[in-house]
Amino acid sequence: MIKGSSLKRFKSLVMAAIFSVSIISTAIASSAADQIPFPYDAKYPNGAYSCLADSQSIGNNLVRSEWEQWKSAHITSNGARGYKRVQRDASTNYDTVSEGLGYGLLLSVYFGEQQLFDDLYRYVKVFLNSNGLMSWRIDSSGNIMGKDSIGAATDADEDIAVSLVFAHKKWGTSGGFNYQTEAKNYINNIYNKMVEPGTYVIKAGDTWGGSNVTNPSYFAPAWYRIFADFTGNSGWINVANKCYEIADKARNSNTGLVPDWCTANGTPASGQGFDFYYDAIRYQWRAAIDYSWYGTAKAKTHCDAISNFFKNIGYANIKDGYTISGSQISSNHTATFVSCAAAAAMTGTDTTYAKNIYNECVKVKDSGNYTYFGNTLRMMVLLYTTGNFPNLYTYNSQPKPDLKGDVNNDGAIDALDIAALKKAILTQTTSNISLTNADMNNDGNIDAIDFAQLKVKLLN
């Protein structure tokens, strides 16, 4: 509670801030209402863990910071036809792949950045092919990179589609698109062009793949359950079931590892890799989400086996490639493999290991010319392992205590918070404050605007 003497000390400061705060409030009111705002502090319906960080506040602050860094590295308007795109890195001359747009749209909807989401989706629509799906590779100047790049990649389009469903749940009909209509059309295009008729096998793309070649890392059963309910097409449940049927046949019975590519019978696909490498590593991330959200038993069985494989190796010794029987074929300790190993731990019950692999995920971040893939998966997994990746299709945001302004995180909003925020702004040191509580206007920055709004809150 704020005492009368405290109010007097702040009154002159507050009155000086009223004009700037009124401008700020007008700007905030003009943006679309977010029905499910970040941070989520979610408790997943299934599993022992939702947040592996030492505290929810620490986890929230971490992902906010990582998100800003990720955007700085991978969001650009250069070569984006007037919109925004996700660029890769120097190793590919900063090109764009549709997979990156899938990740970028998912991240922007989870962080509640509607303008960025709309700009990314406008870029997607520029490059929709004749099947209504995104051409998979575009150069840094905005040109499709040859005839082989016109086709679509299934993992990208299913991520784009589910992000549109989530956008509908978050923002309704506000913004530049009717997200509901866009989502239904996109999902139907995927089903018609990327699901093999009669078998329910997820194809590799809109023009190739099926029973003869499929990719387990493209299997997104949690998405398919959403697609089924959202569109009324129960065929998507058959697709989800088929994914586990194929994975059961392809995975090694001792290690639990799945291959990059296989046939629907689980055997090697002609001309494709059969190791647990940079495609296959994503399988347990997608499967773990299916367990956390829907409690799918097969997902837990598969993830627990892969997690046990990594646990036996040791979280600090994880390398970036194995045969499915467990023989090491590469020697790098990368964000791709460490982060997806952390995702697999979410289905288990070994808290010591889960905490250790999560902390290793926080620690290991790729640098140099090869940063896009690993650091993007790491960003996705950090959201998931900090309780900030709930199922936005079914999630109901629970009322939370209003802690905005409790800068020093002591459970009270008082003069100490004013002092703590002032010190943080002047010294540019935020390690001793709650960034979530200090960010009064939820813009991701700690600055004089937050200071002014905190003073108004104290007066009230």
UniProtKB/Swiss-Prot annotation:
Residues 400-460 form the Dockerin domain. It catalyses: Endohydrolysis of (1->4)-beta-D-glucosidic linkages in cellulose, lichenin and cereal beta-D-glucans. One of its GO terms (molecular function) is cellulase activity. It is an enzyme of class 3 (hydrolase). The active site is at E99 (proton donor), D155 (nucleophile). It comes from the Bacteria. GO terms for biological process: cellulose catabolic process. InterPro entries: 6-hairpin_glycosidase_sf, 6hp_glycosidase-like_sf, Dockerin_1_rpt, Dockerin_dom, Dockerin_dom_sf, EF_Hand_1_Ca_BS, Glyco_hydro_8, Glyco_hydro_8_CS. Residues 1-32 form the signal peptide. The keyword Hydrolase applies. Pathway: Glycan metabolism; cellulose degradation. There are two forms of the cellulase. The shorter form lacks probably the C-terminal reiterated domains. Monomer. The biological conversion of cellulose to glucose generally requires three types of hydrolytic enzymes: (1) Endoglucanases which cut internal beta-1,4-glucosidic bonds; (2) Exocellobiohydrolases that cut the disaccharide cellobiose from the non-reducing end of the cellulose polymer chain; (3) Beta-1,4-glucosidases which hydrolyze the cellobiose and other short cello-oligosaccharides to glucose. Belongs to the glycosyl hydrolase 8 (cellulase D) family. This is Endoglucanase C. The gene is celCCC.
